[in-house]
């Protein structure tokens, strides 16, 4: 994730339910985005990324991705632009909205460890590879990114051991990392970290923090591994060691069905 953290998505259903449909032409084809009016959260680079693909696009700015989605639902904007998995989560819980299949930009998401922690990187890569080789990876995606409805409950993954695996995350990136109804930090990234802890025979401890604090905390040794929809970039790779990519995401467009 290259954008600033968003507010919790727990109110999205009730917020969107208040809105009606406007008189704008529905976006049904990716090419229609070329001159579309986008709703984007203030303080992110979503507008810059969209403009790099569609120079003639227009932008309206909102306080959060929730407000941007509401603008689309009410007809105040043609599309909302944000991280693909977060938009998919919104669309899954709110009939009448969908994410266009073609992304505007493409990013690879990965977990990060300290530059010298080759053993932990190898363990993460092995878990990712083994899950992809079987059915577990797709089952995990179906669990956290259902076509309709909210994510399924966090699976029970017992982690035990004298050593602790400290997993740093920012629980504002539903469905990758978020706080559920029981006030536990859950999500696809948390599940993956638990599987890594199991492989290493360690006990998982989740450390929730601000998105921008994750890399500094990792470098300082406050956590062992970080993950929260983190985009693999050359600049970040100068200071941390990334795992293999576990998800292809990027900036996508949320539109009315």
Model-assigned labels for residue ranges:
Residues 2-37, 122, 129-205:
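N-terminal hydrophobic or amphipathic helices and topogenic motifs
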Residues 37, 56-61, 65, 69-70, ...:
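Extracytoplasmic small-molecule ligand-binding "clamshell" domains
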Residues 46-49, 107, 123, 136, ...:
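Hydrophobic alpha-helical segments typical of transmembrane helices
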Residues 39-52:
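Secondary-structure junction motif
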Residues 36-41, 255:
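Short, hydrophobic beta-strand segments that form beta-sheet elements in well-ordered domains
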Residues 22-32, 84-106, 115, 194, ...:
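Acidic, polar ligand-binding/catalytic clefts
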Residues 31, 57, 64-68, 74-149:
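Extended, hydrophobic interaction surfaces within ordered domains
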């Amino acid at each position: 994730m290259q954008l600033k953290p968003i507010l919790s998505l727990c109110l999205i259903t009730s917020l969107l339910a208040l809105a009606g449909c406007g008189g704008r032409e529905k976006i049904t084809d990716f090419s229609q985005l070329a001159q579309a009016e986008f709703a984007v959260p203030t303080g992110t680079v979503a507008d810059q990324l969209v403009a790099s693909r569609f120079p003639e696009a227009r932008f309206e700015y909102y306080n959060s991705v929730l407000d941007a989605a509401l603008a689309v639902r009410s007809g105040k904007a043609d599309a909302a632009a944000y991280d693909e998995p977060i938009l998919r989560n919104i669309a899954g819980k709110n009939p009448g909205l969908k994410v266009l299949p073609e992304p505007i930009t493409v990013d690879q998401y990965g977990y990060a460890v300290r530059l010298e922690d080759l053993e932990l990187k190898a363990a993460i890569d092995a878990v990712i590879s083994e899950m992809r080789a079987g059915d577990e990876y797709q089952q995990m995606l179906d669990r956290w990114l259902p076509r309709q409805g909210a994510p399924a409950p966090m699976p029970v993954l017992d982690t035990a051991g004298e050593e602790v695996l400290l997993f740093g995350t920012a629980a504002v990136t539903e469905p990758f990392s978020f706080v559920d109804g029981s006030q536990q930090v859950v999500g696809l990234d948390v599940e993956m970290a638990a599987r890594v802890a199991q492989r290493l025979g360690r006990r998982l401890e989740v450390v929730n923090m601000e998105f921008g604090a994750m890399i500094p905390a990792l470098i300082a040794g406050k956590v062992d591994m970080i993950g929260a929809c983190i985009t693999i970039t050359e600049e970040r790779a100068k200071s941390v060691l990334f795992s293999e990519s576990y998800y292809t995401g990027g900036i996508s467009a949320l539109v009315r069905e």
